[in-house]
């Protein structure tokens, strides 16, 4: 069964809904996001260096991108484009409508990011992401190397100006991000 913690969940899922497994085969899955224009759910399978997509109409799971550069977190921006945190290329990128990939940020003050992990887009269009060391600790989910930064941070990126700022610097290994419904809390 489904345990409902927040009653607003019932606005999304009916009482007769059931949880079903549609696919198995990922070593571990991260960053699931629904792409409404394509009507697919995309997610990362980090150690297998690929992204997968599930099509609810055909009930099929296929490869979305391989290799994926050890992608982790995914979300969509206000225009419905896929925004991805990537370990191997130490960046946050955006998949454009034509399928090309734009690197939005890969450095802070000239130093390579560690391994962007999770990412969310606020209603004002800013992109917030975590940058722990997971993807630089071994070659299993990125590239083993020393960090160029003095810590592991949560960042805010303004995609219009390119301005990148640290919004949290006291966490050892920041991971998942979400805003409260009114965006007053991260």
Cite the ranges covered by each PLM segment.
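Sequence-structural signature of mature extracellular/luminal beta-sheet repeat domains
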Residues: 1-186
């Amino acid at each position: 069964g489904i345990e409902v913690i927040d009653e607003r969940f019932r606005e999304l899922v009916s009482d007769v809904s059931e949880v079903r497994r549609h696919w198995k085969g990922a070593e571990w899955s991260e960053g699931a996001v629904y792409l409404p224009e394509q009507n697919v759910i995309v997610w990362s399978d980090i150690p297998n260096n690929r992204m997968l997509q599930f099509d609810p109409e055909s009930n099929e799971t296929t490869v979305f991108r391989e290799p994926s550069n050890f992608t982790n977190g995914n979300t969509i921006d206000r225009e419905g484009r896929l925004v991805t945190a990537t370990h191997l290329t130490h960046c946050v990128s955006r998949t454009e409508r034509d399928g090309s990939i734009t690197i939005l940020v890969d450095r802070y003050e000239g130093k390579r990011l560690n391994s962007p992990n999770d990412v969310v887009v606020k209603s004002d269009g800013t992109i917030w992401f975590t940058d722990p060391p997971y993807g630089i600790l071994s070659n299993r989910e990125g590239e083993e190397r020393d960090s160029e930064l003095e810590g592991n941070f949560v960042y805010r990126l303004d995609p219009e100006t390119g301005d990148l700022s640290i919004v949290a610097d006291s966490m050892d290994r920041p991971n998942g991000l979400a805003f409260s419904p009114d965006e007053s809390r991260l």
